[in-house]
Amino acid sequence: MRITWFGHSAFRLDFGASHVLIDPFFTGNPAFEGGDAARASAVEGATHILITHGHGDHVGDTLAVAGETGAKVVTNYDLCMWLASKGLTNFDPMNTGGTTDQGAFRVTLVHADHSAGMSEAGVTVPLGLPNGIIVRAAGEPTVYHMGDTDIFGDMALIQEIYRPDVLMVPIGDRFTMGAETAALAVRKFFAPKAVIPCHYGSFPIIAPSADAFVSALDGSGIQVVVPHKGTAVTIP
């Protein structure tokens, strides 16, 4: 599996014939680099778009990318219906605890401690529950994108049930857990092959770098991968 980070919480997974975007926040993302050409490359051939929750910095360019590529959107029911009201036609709704079969892989929505909603005419429209996302494909590492969340005790059950190999962990503080708490979550609950920090280095009110997270896991034996934005890393 090749994993590409685009800044903030936006990722792309490439394995076999599947090209999966998670939280495709490009337009307006201060951390996204390369402009229109980089965006075109990031979304090229996308087959699926997975969204952890209904906030603008995670829904991002979903409608535009789905229109450009025909990618299927997989997310919680309420957010799917809201996107459908905006013109989305190819979607697969689900909810917390559920699993959907996408053919080459399965998607499961798990718990996250956060909120979800978008502002319309000055009023916040609730968009279902926030989630983490588990991606499982035969012969590939199991990926757990935590979405936006704090640490919570039932991460132990996520480890017991899904045994993720790759964690995408929000570390930016203020809107999610910060570096030390995120490192505690990784050490206490998981045994991954690799951990990729995210949700930092974008907006000035969250952590500017992953340095504190990397330091907090120093000596743990856990591999922390801090990718260069837009450059794929391979996880066996």
From Swiss-Prot:
Entry-linked InterPro entries: Metallo-B-lactamas, RibonucZ/Hydroxyglut_hydro, UPF0173, UPF0173_UPF0282_UlaG_hydrolase
UniProt-listed Gene3D superfamilies: Ribonuclease Z/Hydroxyacylglutathione hydrolase-like
A family per Pfam: Lactamase_B_3
Keyword line: Hydrolase
An example molecular function term from Gene Ontology annotations: hydrolase activity
Family recorded in the similarity comment: Belongs to the UPF0173 family.
NCBIfam families the UniProt entry points to: PRK00685.1
Name of the molecule in the record: UPF0173 metal-dependent hydrolase Mnod_3315
